[in-house]
């Protein structure tokens, strides 16, 4: 497997507005309630690594609208996909609007991974312990399953050569499906009646509160592989950890959200918004 990532970041940026690509990227058969593009599912170990690194405020949940014939549970009067009558979800990385210019385009405000340097279009945590397993191996799992990669979508709609070698890596982590994924990549919220009013609506419009996100991140961190069980003490500790987190990521997301529409989309703003708050640097391209 070989890819050309320079000046791309198609897997990290919601670039649909640049190429008139209206369809929503989907992972699995059910439609996500949110509209976040290419939200990468984190494993339980990934989630714990982010919490250990003091980056819990970078994480957000995804829930799915239930199909008529699929298991579901009512939350806020809406049927959401469920596992044993518990809302099913995974955890990904938040995508605030950032000024980016992929594919040699003019700068634009686009939803972008919280850890992507808007100027170099490189990941700020690429060599860190919390770098997600799925990101490290992308697009290996897609190639192994014969599923279209984001590299190929960019080639089709923008042009250029991004996927240079489509042979799946000989060694990569095991794919998690069905029961294998429960408690490890797909989680079950144990007490849906405890969810605050309006949560599903806030999720749909991308306006979750810190408390909303912390509830789900804590459940993921306290889950056990292969089961819907959640360890109460670990859950409470993780919840408090997320709420107490005040990282450069969370502060930068707040400023990006305030700046969108007010400032010209200059990728160089990343220095003032992220680097000045302690964001790790990126090497640039040789």
Where are these regions (language model features)?
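Short loop/turn segments that flank or connect secondary-structure elements
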Residues: 1-286
């Amino acid at each position: 497997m070989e890819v050309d990532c320079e000046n791309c970041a198609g897997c990290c940026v919601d670039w649909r507005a640049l190429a008139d690509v209206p369809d929503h990227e989907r992972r699995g058969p059910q439609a996500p309630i949110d509209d976040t593009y290419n939200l990468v599912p984190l494993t339980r170990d990934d989630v714990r690594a982010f919490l250990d690194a003091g980056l819990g405020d970078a994480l957000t949940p995804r829930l799915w609208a239930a199909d008529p014939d699929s298991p579901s549970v009512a939350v806020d009067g809406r049927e959401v996909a469920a596992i044993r009558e518990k809302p099913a979800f995974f955890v990904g990385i938040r995508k605030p609007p950032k000024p980016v210019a992929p594919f040699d385009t003019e700068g634009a405000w686009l939803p972008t991974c919280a850890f992507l340097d808007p100027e170099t279009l490189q990941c700020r945590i690429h060599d860190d312990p919390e770098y997600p397993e799925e990101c490290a191996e992308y697009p290996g799992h897609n190639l192994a399953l014969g599923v279209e990669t984001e590299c190929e979508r960019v080639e089709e709609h923008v042009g250029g050569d991004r996927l240079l070698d489509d042979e799946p890596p000989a060694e990569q982590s095991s794919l998690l499906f069905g029961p294998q994924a429960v408690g490890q990549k797909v989680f079950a919220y144990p007490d849906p009646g405890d969810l605050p009013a309006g949560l599903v609506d806030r999720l749909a419009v991308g306006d979750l509160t810190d408390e909303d996100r912390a509830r789900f991140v804590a459940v993921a961190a306290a889950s056990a592989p292969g089961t819907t069980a959640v360890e109460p003490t670990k859950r409470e500790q993780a919840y408090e950890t997320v709420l107490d987190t005040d990282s450069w990521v969370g502060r930068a997301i707040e400023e990006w959200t305030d700046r969108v529409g007010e400032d010209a989309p200059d990728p160089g703003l990343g220095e003032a918004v992220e680097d000045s708050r302690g964001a790790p640097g990126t090497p640039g391209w040789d």
